[in-house]
């Protein structure tokens, strides 16, 4: 059972993000798409029609000013006769060119284009007419070649843990009893801000036929500031600097092959020697009237554990550690086929120097906790994690069935615990009423096999590995079922839901974290309304 009744975590954060990009490139003429050509022809016809209507209206006003009766039929007949003499696109030959001085007559003049026969003349006129028409349906397109980019990001965080009536001996250690609250009350505060500047130069993909991929080079500078409590009730300040450089190679255009690779290396500061390489590639193959996508993802990360694994000060927790860099490698493959609504994903992770929190405590005869302590840990050996996931959806008329099944295996469950199997399924009917009212009626279920799930530390606001040995608690092997109804019309959605409808069934082991039970059966009703013009 949860023994803390009056404790809160408060998180305040503010964020500023600014980026600006300057492009260098050129303009070129490209043919409009079929849709754009149709739209322009419609606009040209509309413009001509409007001009004719305006001219008629002007003639009507002029006749009225002169005290005459406007004869619309005569006007239309006059306009038809005015424009019937020459078809659209007809050309006037112009003045006869002078003869070549050596030519005896026009037929031998080398300065004129020789047109032999009526068919050739018609063909030449047709080509000229088509070229004139085609020139109307080209547009100017700006093609950026090189981009100069600067991005700055600033994040500010403050966390407060506040508690009252903490049970005696609940925590194993006490490092100070000073500050805003003392005795059985706690007021711990940490502060952190982070500013990152990134400068990049990018050669953009596709600006000519030889530029098959985009290329980017960048440099980043990080400044991180932390404030932790001291035993005297003040704050101790820490500053960290990091300079890194990297590059990116990507291809996103085209239908068959796409890829993206990014590498970044830390040069100076706390992240000196870090390395991050990320890449993905996908191949899209026409198959059975649809597209079969085969995608591969991989990364290699050698990174410094975050500041709070290395340094943390609080009234009941205190550490300053020198930790090794974590090395994390992943290889993942994904197979997607929209026609059958199938997605299969398989991933293998290997982690060395994995860093995590472990929480331990003693249990009294009354079932209460004493001697609680949270400790940062680092597993020097390697950990392997295998993940296989299948997403399979079905649809038959108004009936829909969505499924996701995941298998996982960790080589060290005591350090990186995962359920062997978890599933999500959602069965519902979807239909329309009077063509405007969208209705969903259904039920969903979540389930995972039992395992020693991560514990929760309210003092840290973090999940931790259970560190109580034989007293570790297993949760799971219990389905959570919800039933619901959604009604959607235009910008408004109404819903009703009965969550955890199966509460009280089976062994009642409905926990997502040890000692933190879920709510029992709850009925919810609500409305979602989008306000926009």
What residue ranges belong to the model's regions?
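Periplasmic-side early beta-strands and strand-to-turn transitions of outer-membrane beta-barrels
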Residues: 1-2
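Long intrinsically disordered, low-complexity regions that are acidic and Ser/Thr-rich
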Residues: 47-123
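Exposed, low-structure sequence patches enriched in small/polar residues
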Residues: 6-50, 54, 69, 101, ...
């Amino acid at each position: 059972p949860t023994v803390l009744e009056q404790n809160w975590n408060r998180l305040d954060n503010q964020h500023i993000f600014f980026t600006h990009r300057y492009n260098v490139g050129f303009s070129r003429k490209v043919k409009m798409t079929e849709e754009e050509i149709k739209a322009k022809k419609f606009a040209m016809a509309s413009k001509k029609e409007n001009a004719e209507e305006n001219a008629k209206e002007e003639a009507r006003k002029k006749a009225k000013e002169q005290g005459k009766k406007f004869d619309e039929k005569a006007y239309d007949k006059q306009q038809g006769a005015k424009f019937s003499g020459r078809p659209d696109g007809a050309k006037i030959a112009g003045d006869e060119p002078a003869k070549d001085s050596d030519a005896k007559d026009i037929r031998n003049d080398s300065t004129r284009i020789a047109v032999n026969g009526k068919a050739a003349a018609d063909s030449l006129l047709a080509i000229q007419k088509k070229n004139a028409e085609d020139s109307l349906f080209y547009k100017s397109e700006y093609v950026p070649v090189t981009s100069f980019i600067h991005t700055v990001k600033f994040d500010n965080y403050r966390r407060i843990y506040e508690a009252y009536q903490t049970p005696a001996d609940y925590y194993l250690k006490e490092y100070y009893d000073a500050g805003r609250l003392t005795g059985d009350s706690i007021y711990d505060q940490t502060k952190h801000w982070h500013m990152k500047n990134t400068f990049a130069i990018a050669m953009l993909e596709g600006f000519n036929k030889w530029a098959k991929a985009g290329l980017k080079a960048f440099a980043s500078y990080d400044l991180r500031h932390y404030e932790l409590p001291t035993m005297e009730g003040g704050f101790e300040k820490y500053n960290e600097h990091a300079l890194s450089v990297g590059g990116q190679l990507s291809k996103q255009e085209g239908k068959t092959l796409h890829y993206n690779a990014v590498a970044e290396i830390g040069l100076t500061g706390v992240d000196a020697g870090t390395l991050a390489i990320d890449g993905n590639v996908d191949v899209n193959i026409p198959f059975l009237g649809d597209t079969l996508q085969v995608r591969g993802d991989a990364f290699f990360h050698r990174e410094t554990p975050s500041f709070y694994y290395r340094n943390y000060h609080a009234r009941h927790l205190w550490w300053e550690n020198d930790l090794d860099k974590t090395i994390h490698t992943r290889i993942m493959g994904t197979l997607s086929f929209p026609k059958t609504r199938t997605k299969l994903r398989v991933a293998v992770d290997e982690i060395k120097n994995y860093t995590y929190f472990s929480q331990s405590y003693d249990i009294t005869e009354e079932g209460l906790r004493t001697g609680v302590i949270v400790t940062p840990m680092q597993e020097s050996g390697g950990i392997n994690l295998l993940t296989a996931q299948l997403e399979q959806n079905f649809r038959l008329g108004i009936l829909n069935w969505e499924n996701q099944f995941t298998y996982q295996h960790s080589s060290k469950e005591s350090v990186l615990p995962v359920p062997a199997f978890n599933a999500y399924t959602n069965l519902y009917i979807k239909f329309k009423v009077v063509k405007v009212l969208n209705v969903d009626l259904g039920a969903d279920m979540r389930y995972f096999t039992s395992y020693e799930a991560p514990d929760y530390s309210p003092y840290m606001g973090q999940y931790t590995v259970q560190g109580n040995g034989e007293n570790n608690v297993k949760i799971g092997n219990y389905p959570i079922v919800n039933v619901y109804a959604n009604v959607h019309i235009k910008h408004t959605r109404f819903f009703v839901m009965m969550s955890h409808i199966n509460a009280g069934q089976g062994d009642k082991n409905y926990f997502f974290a040890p000692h933190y039970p879920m709510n029992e059966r709850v009925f919810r009703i609500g409305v979602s309304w989008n306000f926009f013009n």
